[in-house]
């Protein structure tokens, strides 16, 4: 490859001491070497900061934050200082295959109108294997993100946002993550939505990224029930995108704060109804199980004794 533009790789880190070396080494071992690698410690409480400072490579830049920003604030600040013509992302508990950056750069050099490029991925950890089907073409990606609907994409294998590489033009045009989504599950999707409104996208149909959902990860913490924002973030995102696409209303604009609050309440309501439906479904499934029927049978004499009048 004669033309070798600089690629900035951002690796946000929070309490990932046990995994971060694998993630960073997967970038250091990329066959494409013209990189600047930003290791971003978002106020970890373990020894993550010490781990990332121990790497000895002149391509690495370490940035540490005194207060946790839920990833969004830290990444946005670093994005203001990147020098790369293209920007790639790597989650600190995942890892990339050696050819990932090279393959993505080649796509940008082929198509100068490209603003964002993803790759296929492989599940690692408790769940293994490849996703069943993902969006590959610009048309498919736009259908996934510009017509985003939580109820439509549930049960599918969505595009894996951490695999994305974007052009500097896409960054300058969209500005990074919206601060409203700090600590929510949808921060990547909302930003990608804004990029795909203005630029072409593509997914390389090769598993060049290894994705792990582990207990303690940011994704796990968001989805395990401890984070109240998780329950309604998806339906809320659907409403925000719908308003923007069909009614040309930027719900996140300051002047629309009251509308945002209304949509938050609606999303909470919908999430609660969905949760109750799920609980009811689980209850019915359990009542059909052999263990439930056996329990009822074993307890039937006690119920007769309890109800008997003396």
PLM regions and their residue ranges:
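Conserved nucleotide-sugar donor-binding catalytic segment
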Residues: 80, 140-233
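Short aromatic/hydrophobic "clamp" motif used to bind/position activated sugar donors
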Residues: 87
């Amino acid at each position: 490859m004669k033309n070798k533009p600089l690629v900035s790789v951002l690796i946000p880190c929070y309490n990932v001491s046990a995994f971060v070396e694998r993630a960073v080494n997967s970038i250091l071992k990329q066959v494409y070497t013209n990189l600047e690698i930003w290791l971003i410690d978002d106020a970890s409480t373990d020894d993550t900061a010490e781990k990332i400072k121990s790497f000895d490579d002149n391509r690495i830049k370490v940035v540490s934050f005194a207060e946790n920003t839920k990833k969004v604030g830290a990444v946005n600040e670093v994005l203001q200082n990147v020098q790369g013509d293209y920007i790639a992302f790597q989650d600190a508990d995942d890892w990339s295959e050696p050819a990932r950056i090279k393959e993505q750069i080649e796509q940008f050099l082929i198509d100068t109108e490209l603003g964002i490029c993803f790759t296929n991925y492989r599940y690692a950890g408790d769940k293994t294997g490849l996703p069943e089907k993902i969006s590959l073409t610009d048309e498919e990606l736009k259908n996934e993100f510009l017509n985003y609907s939580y109820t439509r994409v549930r049960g599918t294998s969505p595009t894996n946002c951490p695999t994305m590489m974007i052009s500097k033009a896409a960054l300058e045009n969209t500005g990074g993550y919206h601060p409203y989504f700090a600590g929510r599950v949808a921060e990547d999707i909302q930003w990608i939505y804004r990029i795909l409104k203005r630029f072409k996208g593509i997914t390389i149909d090769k598993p060049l990224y290894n994705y792990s959902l582990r207990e303690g990860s940011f994704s796990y913490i968001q989805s395990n029930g401890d984070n109240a924002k998780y329950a309604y973030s998806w339906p809320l995102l659907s409403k925000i995108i719908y308003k923007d696409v069909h009614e040309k209303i930027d719900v996140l604009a300051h002047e629309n704060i009251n509308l945002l609050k209304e949509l938050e309440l609606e999303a909470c309501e919908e999430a609660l109804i969905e949760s109750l439906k799920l609980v009811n479904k689980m209850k019915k499934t359990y009542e059909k199980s052999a263990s439930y029927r056996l329990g009822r049978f074993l307890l039937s004499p006690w119920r007769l004794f309890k109800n008997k009048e003396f």
